[in-house]
């Protein structure tokens, strides 16, 4: 049995929209996803229970999860849409935020090999 950190919570795409003519950028994010990435980079086996869709934003999340060696729980990729957090920056530097997310994680069993369970943000 390999000891595992079991992480529960949102993964999303951070959309940063600066004032024109700056380009809008998109980055994988979400506090629980970031925790899973950090633990994996520290050498801990990590399993993530999250929700994202089979869409363009979901592919950003999936690529980030896979490139960091995080194990996804079954059905993590079955959401209708992938959550986004959009930050719009005004020319004076003020930011306004819009969150487009739902949280509908199905019932989960904590894996026997989990030595720690972390829930974050929306999951808590």
What do these predicted ranges mean?
Residues 1-71, 85:
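Glycine-rich phosphate/adenosyl-contacting loop at the front of the ribokinase-like
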Residues 45-121:
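Conserved N-terminal subdomain of the carbohydrate kinase-like
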């Amino acid at each position: 049995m390999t000891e595992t950190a079991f992480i529960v919570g949102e993964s999303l795409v951070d959309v940063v929209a600066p004032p024109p003519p700056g380009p809008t950028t998109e980055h994988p994010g979400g506090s629980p996803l970031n925790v899973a990435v950090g633990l994996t980079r520290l050498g801990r086996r990590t399993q993530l229970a999250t929700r994202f869709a089979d869409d363009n934003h979901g592919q950003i999340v999936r690529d980030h999860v896979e490139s960091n060696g995080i194990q996804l729980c079954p059905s993590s990729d079955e959401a209708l849409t992938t959550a986004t957090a959009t930050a719009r920056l005004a020319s004076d530097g003020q930011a306004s935020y819009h969150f487009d997310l739902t949280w509908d994680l199905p019932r989960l069993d904590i894996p026997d090999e989990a030595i720690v369970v972390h829930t974050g943000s929306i999951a808590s």
